[in-house]
Amino acid sequence: MGGSASSQLDEGKCAYIRGKTEASIKNFSPYYSRQYSVAFCNHVRSEVEQQRDLTSQFLKTKPPLEPGTVLYEAELSQFAEDIRKWKDRYVVVKNDFAVESYENKEAYQRGAVPKSRILPAGGKVLTSEEEYSLLSDKHFPDPTASSEKNSQPFLVLPKAFPVYLWQPYLRHGYFCFHEAAEQQKFSALLNDCIRHLNHDYMKQTTFEAQAFLEAVQFFRQEKGHYGAWEVITGDEVQILSKLVMEELLPTLQTDLLPKLKGKKNDRKRAWFGLLEEAYNLVQHQVSEGLSALKEECRALTKDLEGTIRSDMDQIVNSKNFLTGKIRAMVAQPAENRCGESVQPFLASILEELMGPVSSGFSEVRALFEKEVDELSQSFHTTQDGAQLKECLDQLMKLPLDSVKMEPCYTKVTLLPERLLDLQSRFRFPHVDLVVQRTQNYMQELMENAVFTFEQLLSPYLQGEASRTAVAIEKVKLRVLKQYDYDSSTIRKKIFQEALIQITLPTVQKALASTCKPELQKYEQFIFADHTNMIHVENIYEEILYQILLDETLKVITEAAILKKHNLFEDNMALPSESVSSLTDLKTSMGSNQASPARGASAILPGAPGDEAPGSEVFQGPEEKQQQPGVPGSLAREESASISGSSPPSGEDGQVSVSGVDNSAGNPLSADNSAGPLSSHLSEAEAGEPPKDEETAHKRPESSAVPGSLRELKELLTVTVFVESAPEIGNDTLNGTPVPQEDKKEEEEEEESKIHPEASGPAAIQQDSCEESEVREREAHPMPLEAEAPGVNLGTLPEGRGPTSQSTGEGLTENTSCLGPIEEPSEAQGPTEEVLLATVSTQDSTEAGGEAVHSVTVTPQEDATLSSNPICPVENNEGPQVSEDQEVLGGNDSPALAMDTEQINDAHVYECHWEVEDAPSADILDVHDCDVGSPGEW
């Protein structure tokens, strides 16, 4: 039969293994202790500064599965090493990715201890005898194997479809199936388990995990090993155990391999058993030693926490000072080395990475769309809500369906072939780790996509079948748009990590002999109390990393600008990062794999009759309550984006509002009110006759080319129509009515002159003004309706500041009372500046600046339009007050006092108001709107 592994590993050899393990842990301890303190200090700093991850994401993140969730269970044939026979076992794989084997299904159900439990971290899955023999021979350095031919197979298979699980330092697993489909399902599942066990620990963000990985890196650099390391897979105990085994392996091969007797297959089996016994011994001792080391570090940081928190500013300043010193020494040689050995190859490496990675993510997108289309088609056929829920539950399991996801993963497996030259140029043989990490990201993105789809669709499952069918299609398009953006973000992250992982070891190794010895002299700049929190080696590595990061970001940004593989730029104008429901962001029916910014635009619903069929599925309960006519919060938000000026009388009651991009803080500054985008003139401004009510409600269709300048203009323009009757002005001297046409002529004449002087003094009683406004609102409500030509303003990015919010509240509450006008001595200076700012929209636009909000309002009923207290007033003119307001003011308080010698018959009030962004609500429905002063908005 051959030698037994247990007989070769005698007590002396076990003692030797324990001694080597203890020495390795002792050598590793200083690195871990230093990195533990540094990582803990960084953790406290991020906690104090409340640092957050700025990575944007549209899709909802799927919560983790409940512990103990079963991913796979089936009865199959497994080779039992203890009895060296094939046995039928009941195999169960849960979401801890351990492969557990039970005697039978009944034993599993009653909670029996599994016969075997395999954690296949670092393993490889093979499905043919030839592939397995090649791999196992590679890790069996038998000196006599070259002269011996192995005619017999390693195992006699009881069934036609085997699965081999190769593992480093552990016995291999062997499974058999009757059908190829079962073989494919189990092998795909094992690959999923290996990927997650290899990389899930490295994805942890705890400071202890970061400290351990940094310690392993510095520990290996002292031995001349740089960059990625194939055995950094699994958890911290597995990683450190493999570190020890890496040192033990040459000795074990020298001492034990020559003693093995028998045929090649027997010696091979004995060697693998010997390695497993040694590895288990090392792993047990490493687990104990690492636990003790952690307790020491926790006690140390507990004592340091007070110092870290109290001296945080000093620690940060000291580190920044030290960073500047070391960067001055390192920057030039690092940049030279990067320019010679790295920068010329970054673009070509990125090009080779982008193809397979992007094709894999595109395959995931296509799979999601295909599954949703099948779900939709099934619902169209059956119209059964219960069956739809079952299909939706199956869709939620799609990311865990290894067979369906495998074609997506296969697209990325082309990377090793595309990057063959990396092994010779950059000594990076571990492209398979990049492949596995990419596949994990693909599975995670699919999980988020199906979870977002289910969350957005669930409110509409109980409705009518026709509405549910429409909702399925619209939700699918929404999720696909969000997927495109998140896919671009994740792929750029993958490219960044891969480029740095590939090229950083080259720079580190090149500078190790020249720059690293110089680091010791910089330790004198560290305070004695801060030596545990600041280490020059960490700062040195951070500087090298940042230099390479800047170079990689350049090539990735260039690829995004060129739209390669549907990558999006980082500075795209996007809607909010969190989309909680269909009402948050409308998606047009014709959307496909377009930019999220383009997907954000949709049709703004106007009157209820204009709404597209099926669009009600996008309206939440709150939105539906606000639509019938109550202004509500949406109306207040809309009104915050509308600015107005006192209009010439006699024109049609139309308001033209032009959006302003990056408007300045002072809304009355002429310098900040001109822009390259010209404002759209309303029909009243163009001198055209007013249209009837039906025309006012009709939604114009945009003919602008997508992405053109005209489309941008339309995105920034909204037209508000005011329906009102002709107004008869009141002479403020004697209360006699003044014809509106005469007032218009006088106002146009005075407006052409524009006297840069302030009006005389005036005093207003607030109580009487409020009472008059209340009565005016009750008698003459003035609805405003907004239409945006071809654009959904609700999808524009929200950018309201405190000013715009207060503006919206003021307009909705109709606080349009006149405030006290300042004395001439106080108001003359600022009034002259303000008056110069009251230029027309067209003039300011032609001057070349930012686009201006121009508002023209002409009420045609007896509604009161109060002028702004800060608006410019013509010389020797006072505010215009209606007859009703004058009478009401006399009931409760003294009438409006004005100097009759300083008041003319014509009254012109020009005011220019600006808001930063176009409104983002879906409906602008402001009733009883009297244009108040900006100070009250």
From Swiss-Prot:
The modification Phosphoserine is found at residues 578, 581, 595, 601, 646, 708, 768. GO terms for biological process: negative regulation of protein phosphorylation; positive regulation of protein phosphorylation; positive regulation of translation; response to endoplasmic reticulum stress. InterPro entries: Niban-like. Coiled coil: none annotated. Residues 584-710, 724-891 are annotated as: Disordered. Residues 584-595, 655-681, 802-817, 855-869 have a biased composition (Polar residues). Residues 688-701 have a biased composition (Basic and acidic residues). GO terms for cellular component: cytoplasm; membrane. Detected in brain, lung, spleen and skeletal muscle. Expressed in small renal tumors but not in normal kidney. Its main location: cytoplasm. It is found in: Cytoplasm; Membrane. Residues 640-651 have a biased composition (Low complexity). A lipid is attached at residue 2 (N-myristoyl glycine). Keywords: Cytoplasm, Lipoprotein, Membrane, Myristate, Phosphoprotein, Stress response, Translation regulation. It is a lipid-anchor. 'Niban' means 'second' in Japanese. Belongs to the Niban family. Regulates phosphorylation of a number of proteins involved in translation regulation including EIF2A, EIF4EBP1 and RPS6KB1. May be involved in the endoplasmic reticulum stress response. This is Protein Niban 1. It comes from Rattus norvegicus. The lineage of its organism: Eukaryota, Metazoa, Chordata, Craniata, Vertebrata. The gene is Niban1.
